[in-house]
Amino acid sequence: MSDFESALSKYPETPLERELLGAAMLYSSGPTGRPKGIVRPLPEQSPEEPLPVIGFLSGLWRYREDMIYLSPAPLYHSAPQAAVGLTLRMGGTVVIMERFDPADYLRFVEEYQVSHSQLVP
């Protein structure tokens, strides 16, 4: 049994009575320059229900189950974090670069047959 399975076995298998969808905790340095978690209200829906924004963004960016998203940016930023989360929610594959390097980026696009990515000019 793996460590994950062992840890998981300590919790009940029955679902929570009223399980709600979670939300990402984003951080801002604000005026102090110190990280501060931005607490947002949780959506009043179950994890099985898609958020309305999912349909909009998946149509806009053509996210789909067979997509491969390459993330060259740090995941503490809201844009790459949102793109990675949406890719996973749609059933796609995510490739994350440890740090951006133009040559590595182009190599990854070819090696992983990347269909989606997000770059800053």
Feature locations, PLM:
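Residue-level signal for pocket-adjacent positions within structured domains
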Residues: 2-3, 8-11, 33, 58, ...
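A structure-centric signal for secondary-structure junctions around beta-strands
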Residues: 22, 34-35, 66, 91
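Conserved adenylation A10 loop of the ANL superfamily
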Residues: 25-40
